[in-house]
Swiss-Prot record:
Subcellular location: Cell membrane
Region (Disordered) residue spans: 1-25
HAMAP family: Kup
Membrane topology, record value: Multi-pass membrane protein
GO CC field: plasma membrane
Signal peptide: none
TM annotation in the entry: 35-55, 77-97, 127-147, 165-185, 196-216, 234-254, 275-295, 315-335, 365-385, 394-414, 422-442, 447-467
Physiological role: Transport of potassium into the cell. Likely operates as a K(+):H(+) symporter.
Similarity remark: Belongs to the HAK/KUP transporter (TC 2.A.72) family.
Catalysed reactions, as listed in the record: K(+)(in) + H(+)(in) = K(+)(out) + H(+)(out)
Superkingdom classification of source: Bacteria
Name the UniProt record assigns to this protein: Probable potassium transport system protein Kup
Keyword Zinc-finger included in the entry's annotation: no
Length: 657
């Protein structure tokens, strides 16, 4: 199976990013509020549901390194959670990392793009190594995308055993049903449901904050945990306990990467305000309230989040928590689609079939292959681990790895791209990376207890992506040598002796651009010595707009020769347009294409590469096999471009890898 025409003959013109909505004088506050509410429904679902399971996991008596419940330990853990959130989420991400954007876009892939640009300019080996580290961070995110829906929905449904212990055996089946339903509706898009996400999350944050206040009111002394002295005293006074506790404390900052990754859709200012005004206070109040509950009743450690709610509110809280965790899962699933799509555009994955589900937001996409891989993976995790506590350390490993890599890449860019003084970078990076590395080290101690899972997923994804990048570079070089210059090839057509036989009919050759000759066209000429009277060489260019009007659909180039029946057409599509080639041909002006094109009888030629195992030492044998296997998921070009199957000719060329 080849790398596929869909991967080779389709280009995407990716503009830098999606600018956040601008404020207008007349509707200044309305626009700002709408954007913040939208961010609440998409960005903060993951981090906003962390209070469900964080403290419960820290004090889990079945933990291999349990934290004993005592008054001092409760103060220390709550203080450690609070200052971890302040240092990692507020200081690292909100105040610092979110300032490093790729023309408005955020996330680890944006940092990789910046590093690749710097590497192209400077040719630095360090830049290349860090870009590779960034790819591993993106691979860790795929692991996060599998673990988040499993642990989030499980933790919410586990509230059933608090309100009705007899339902405990139904937790896993109910979770599985919710997961299947969640992934099954992805193809319909989330635009309609998404409008409800923001208001639901507002209710969620107000509710957990209110429950926290009720707990604090009963034991206001818990407010002392806001002092960093309690965190430091716990950490250094009980280092053996506190160090291992970090592996669970890090669950409080899960979703921090989402704040940065979704910056392109909502803007840094809207996300910052949503975090500081509502999300941070609500989460802190919930943690303080749960700590206060444990001060008065240590037996509540089995489920402090749900037991914090009054008895009459526990059923509604279970339902609300389930809705919130579904929203959190939706955010990370959409993030996986975006990362996969960006990885394909950067050449780390083959061209995937991407369906855009919104005309107003380019980021709302559906990638079928990724969707079903995620669903199977999430269900496997649910049935294998069966509880949120069992998944906690797998989750922590994915989070700490991504955060550490993001922080490292950020400070390298701060120094090399922004020219920040070295002493300032060393101080800032030293402090924040020390915190990140402590969390990472604590999670590494949990390798045998589940932390191996995200590393295995990340290593697998990293290997696939780097192998595809390497293999694609090998194939591209070989293909360019085989194709040759389009201008030279067209010139040679006029110099054939005896002249080429021009047979009646229209031939449409899809190609990657105007620089090289289509392999199918070259093979037809060199082997058959014939060419149709009317030849259209077409390249596809997708623009970052919903739709392109028909008046701006095409650009025609006669390639330097008039009246020879050969033209090059560049067709422009928006990301919501279905790229239908026959429809494009009907739009062409016969005066510009050297006569009318017989669309209903035209033949369409695709160049397809057959990949074979070569003897050249380009890659290890197992990587060659992996590259060839990965090529099978490339989207079918004929179907993608709307070509009639009975008049589509696929002409293959063999390339050794």
């Amino acid at each position: 199976m080849g790398s596929g025409p869909a991967d080779e003959e389709h280009t995407v013109d990716t503009e830098p990013g999606v600018s956040p909505p601008r404020r207008t004088v007349g509707g200044r506050e309305t626009v700002r509020a709408a954007v913040v509410v939208g961010a609440l429904g998409v960005v903060f679902g993951d981090i906003g549901t962390s209070p469900i399971y964080t403290i419960q996991t820290v004090f889990n008596p079945e933990d291999p390194h349990p934290v004993p419940i005592s008054t001092n330990n409760v103060y220390g853990v709550v203080s450690l959670i609070f200052w971890s959130v302040m240092l990692i989420v507020t200081a690292t991400y909100v105040l610092l990392v979110m300032r490093a954007d790729n023309d408005g876009e955020g996330g680890v892939m944006a940092l990789i793009t910046l590093l690749r640009r710097m590497g192209a300019v400077r040719g630095s080996r360090v830049t290349a190594v860090l870009a590779g580290l960034g790819i591993f961070g993106a691979a860790l995110f795929f692991g996060d995308s599998m673990i988040t829906p499993a642990i989030s929905v499980l933790s919410a449904v586990e509230g059933l055993k608090v309100v009705e212990p007899g339902l405990e055996e139904w937790i896993v089946p109910i979770t599985a049903v919710i997961i299947v339903a969640l992934f099954s509706v992805q193809r319909r898009g989330t635009a309609a449901v998404g409008r409800l996400f923001g208001p639901v999350m507002i209710v969620w944050f107000v509710s957990i904050g209110a429950c926290g206040v009720s707990g604090i009111a009963r034991h206001p002394e818990i407010l002392k945990a806001l002092s960093p002295t309690y965190a430091l005293s716990f950490f250094f006074g009980h280092f053996g306990i506190a160090f291992f506790a970090l592996a669970a404390v890090v669950l409080a900052v899960t979703g921090a990467e989402a704040l940065y990754a979704d910056m392109g859709h909502f803007g840094r200012r809207a996300i910052t305000r949503g975090w500081l005004v509502l999300v941070l206070p609500a989460c802190v109040l919930s943690y303080l309230g749960q700590g206060a509950l444990l001060l008065g009743d240590q037996s509540a450690v089995s489920s402090p989040f749900f037991l914090l709610a009054p008895g009459w509110a526990r059923w509604p809280m279970v339902l609300l928590a389930t809705a919130a965790t579904v929203i959190a899962s939706q955010a990370v699933i959409t993030g996986a689609y975006s990362v996969a799509s960006q990885a394909a555009q950067l050449g780390y994955l083959p061209r995937l079939r991407v369906a855009h589900t919104s005309e107003s937001t380019i980021g709302q996409i559906y990638v079928p292959w990724i969707n079903w891989v995620l669903m199977v993976s999430v269900l496997t995790l649910v049935f294998a681990f069966r509880s949120s506590a069992a998944l906690a350390y797998a989750f922590g490993m994915a989070v700490t790895g991504t955060i550490t890599i993001t922080t490292l890449l950020f400070f390298y860019i701060v120094r090399t791209r922004w020219g920040t003084p070295l002493w300032l970078v060393v101080c800032g990076a030293g402090c924040l990376l020390a915190v990140d590395l402590l969390f990472l080290a604590a999670n590494l101690t949990k390798l045998v207890h589940g932390a191996w899972l995200p590393l295995l997923i990340a290593l697998t994804a990293f290997t696939v992506m780097t192998t595809w990048q390497r293999g694609r570079a090998i194939v591209t070089r070989a293909r360019e040598r085989a194709e040759g210059s389009l201008g030279d090839f067209v010139g040679q057509l006029h110099d054939y002796r005896p002249p080429l036989v021009r047979v009646p009919g229209t031939a449409v050759f899809l190609n990657r651009g105007k620089q090289t000759a289509p392999l199918a066209m070259r093979a037809n000429v060199e082997h058959n010595r014939v060419l149709q009277q009317h030849v259209v060489i077409m390249s596809i260019n997708t623009l970052p707009v919903p739709r392109v009007p028909d008046t701006e659909r095409t650009e025609i180039d006669k390639l330097g020769y008039a009246e020879d029946g050969i033209v090059h057409v560049t067709a422009f599509f928006g990301y919501m347009d279905a790229p239908n080639i026959p429809d494009v041909l009907r739009l062409l002006d016969p005066a510009e294409t050297e006569g009318p094109i017989a669309v209903d009888s035209a033949s369409y030629f695709l160049s397809k590469i057959e990949l074979t195992m070569g003897t050249a030492p380009t890659m290890a044998t197992w990587r060659k096999r992996l590259f060839i296997a990965t090529s099978y998921i490339t989207a079918d070009a004929a179907e993608y471009f709307g070509l009639p199957g009975e008049r589509t000719v696929i002409m293959g060329s063999r390339i050794d890898v």
